[in-house]
Amino acid sequence: MNSLVATPPVPPHIYEYSRLSPSRPMSTPSHTPTTNRKRKAEDEHNDFDSRMSASPTNSPAFTPRTLPSSSRQIKRARPNMGGRPLSLPRLLETLDTDALRGVLRSICDRHPNLADEVVQTAPRPSVASALQVLRNYQSALQSSFPLGGNPESDYAYNRVRQPLGNLLEALSDFTPHFLPPNETQPSISLSYLDDVTEIIHQLPRWSSPQNNIERDSAYDEICKAWILVIREAAKRGGGIQLQYGGWDQKLAKHNQNSGGRLQAAVNDLASSLGWMHGPESQGFGSPGGNDLGSIREQLLSGTYGLGTPVKVGPW
């Protein structure tokens, strides 16, 4: 009978409470909250590390790049290997002075219209460069002499005839270049003539007079060059450059070494500087001539009257 007794209905709010608030055990371990907080801190730290290590996908500075594949060539591709001639700049680098000179001479011979352009483009030869070329010819002449025997004999002359002709030809070609009106500076012309005359002094002397004709002709040509330059230099400042350059003494020494072959140039120099040397030469040994020469030297040097006392008071 008791089993048939109906149980009283449970109020609805009991079901609602049981759904919203599930039952929990009454007794929980004391260490559970601490463990949960520790795990939560570790999870937050790991989450922060993962966010910092990850690259932002929306960053404007990030540009995705693809790594080069193994088939892509990193270095510049070279053309197909094969024989080919050198370019003009590389070819010119391999040529020495003699070879380059020969190439230019050959081109100018085949194309005469290029000769003037080469002359205008090339730098003007200096006295030093011209003398270096002449000394090279002189060295070739000296090395052509036979060993032993008489260096003034006809045999020696025949052995050195070709290099001797090359030197004399170079002298006749270079000298007009340093003469007026092509050379406008008398100092450059005089400097060239001074060195070239010394080279002529060193030309070999031969026992046969006919072999010395070329040497005598060289003296005649250089004497004419001296006269031309002296007259041109005398027009510049009354010839003061000739006086203070000591060219009268240098030319007199050259004339002595040549055996008087330059006497005409010495006379022309004395005539050009006659207003300086005339009274001294005419009154040589007389007190008057020496006094006039001394006064002229003081005037030219700017020392005239420095030792004279200045008069003070009424004249």
From Swiss-Prot:
**Residues annotated as signal peptide:** none
Q: Which Gene3D superfamilies match?
A: Tethering factor for nuclear proteasome Cut8/Sts1
Q: Tell me the domain of life.
A: Eukaryota
Compositional bias (Basic and acidic residues): 40-50
- One MF term from GO for this chain? proteasome binding
Which keywords accompany this UniProt record? Cytoplasm, Nucleus, Protein transport, Transport
Q: Where does it primarily localize? A: cytoplasm
Q: Which GO terms describe its cellular component?
A: cytoplasm; nucleus
Q: Where is the composition biased (Polar residues)?
A: 20-35, 52-72
Any matching Pfam family: Cut8
Quote the subcellular location field of this record: Cytoplasm; Nucleus
Q: Which GO terms describe its biological process?
A: nuclear protein quality control by the ubiquitin-proteasome system; proteasome localization; protein transport
This chain's function reads:
Involved in ubiquitin-mediated protein degradation. Regulatory factor in the ubiquitin/proteasome pathway that controls the turnover of proteasome substrates. Targets proteasomes to the nucleus and facilitates the degradation of nuclear proteins.
The entry sums up its family as follows: Belongs to the cut8/STS1 family.
Subunit notes for this chain? Binds the proteasome.
Q: What is this protein called?
A: Tethering factor for nuclear proteasome sts1
Q: Which organism is it from?
A: Emericella nidulans (strain FGSC A4 / ATCC 38163 / CBS 112.46 / NRRL 194 / M139)
Gene that this polypeptide is encoded by:
sts1
